[in-house]
A protein has these predicted regions:
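Hydrophobic alpha-helical segments of integral membrane proteins
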Residues: 5, 9-13, 102-105, 129, ...
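Short, solvent-exposed coil/turn elements at secondary-structure transition points
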Residues: 26-28, 63-65, 117, 186, ...
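A generic local structural motif
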Residues: 8, 19-25, 45-46, 99, ...
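Short, charge-rich binding segments
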Residues: 27, 49-51, 103-105, 130-134, ...
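Non-catalytic C-terminal accessory region of glycerolipid acyltransferases
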Residues: 118-241
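Catalytic core of membrane glycerolipid acyltransferases/transacylases, capturing the structured
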Residues: 30-116
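Helix-to-loop junction immediately C-terminal to a conserved catalytic motif
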Residues: 3, 10-42, 51
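Conserved beta-strand segments of alpha/beta enzyme cores
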Residues: 19-21, 58, 110, 179
Length: 241
């Protein structure tokens, strides 16, 4: 899909499904490559992030959601029944109908399938991502671990650190440090962009993965909580170590 068509589709989605407020636009990267890291906030998160960021992004998507046979199972349990409150067999029919649209749309938008539970196949995710980054483009990652319980206040699940491997691979292949931009999406139709956190190649691999993961998680939680208490301006000044 060409960029013009991408922005047209995103604009339509934004008009009907989001129409929210972007805070911290001055923190957006002036050029790529870069990686955006965001909380998920159920179905609203991906829509909010894609519609708010004024550049084309390539989101990481669970591989099963891009498989025409497996996607209805995921969608039925995670969205149609849990969020739309449909019951079987109607939920099954609705899921299949939605997937006939969503799966082709994911591919058209340039989404990258993520094989998080399959270590060997995760290499394919990284290879595709490297191709995107080396073209100076942008990737969007929602690193919450869906297998773990949500925090009752932030509605977030603990982050996984697989996204940090992008920094490792990019530095190995280019000798440059990749920037990761935190995004905090709130249910009041507000999205905050924070200042970038830069991959540090001087740290041991394991330490840097943990550092990026924890720093990004803490930063996004901090920005979210400032939005929660209604102070959008301080959401941009969350201190990072």
């Amino acid at each position: 899909m060409k960029d013009g068509m991408y922005h047209f589709i995103v604009g339509v989605f934004g008009f009907f499904l989001w129409r929210g407020k972007l805070i911290g636009e001055e923190n957006l990267p002036r050029h790529g490559p870069a990686v955006f890291i965001s909380n998920h906030l159920d179905a609203a998160g991906p829509i909010a992030a894609i519609c708010s960021i004024p550049v084309r992004v390539h989101p990481w998507v669970i591989a099963d959601m891009m498989d025409k046979d497996l996607a209805p199972i995921w969608l039925q349990a995670d969205f149609v029944e849990r969020q739309l409150h449909f019951k079987p067999p109607v939920s099954r029919w609705v899921s299949r109908a939605l997937c006939s649209i969503s799966v082709p749309l994911f591919y058209s938008l340039g989404c990258i399938p993520v094989y998080a539970a399959q270590y060997q196949r995760m290499h394919a995710t990284l290879e595709t991502s490297m191709g995107v980054l080396q073209e100076g483009k942008y990737i969007l990652v929602f690193p919450e671990d869906y297998r773990l319980p949500k925090d009752p206040v932030t509605k977030m699940q603990p982050f996984q650190h697989s996204f940090a491997r992008l920094g490792e691979r990019y530095y190995t292949e280019t000798g440059e440090s990749l920037e990761f931009y935190p995004l905090a999406i709130h249910g009041t139709r507000r999205l905050v962009v924070g200042k970038p956190i830069v991959f540090n190649p001087l740290n041991p691999v394991g330490l840097e993965r943990r550092r990026l993961k924890q720093l990004m998680e803490d930063t996004i939680i901090g920005m979210y909580m400032h939005l929660e208490v209604g102070n959008a301006s301080t959401a941009l000044s969350v201190e990072r170590k």
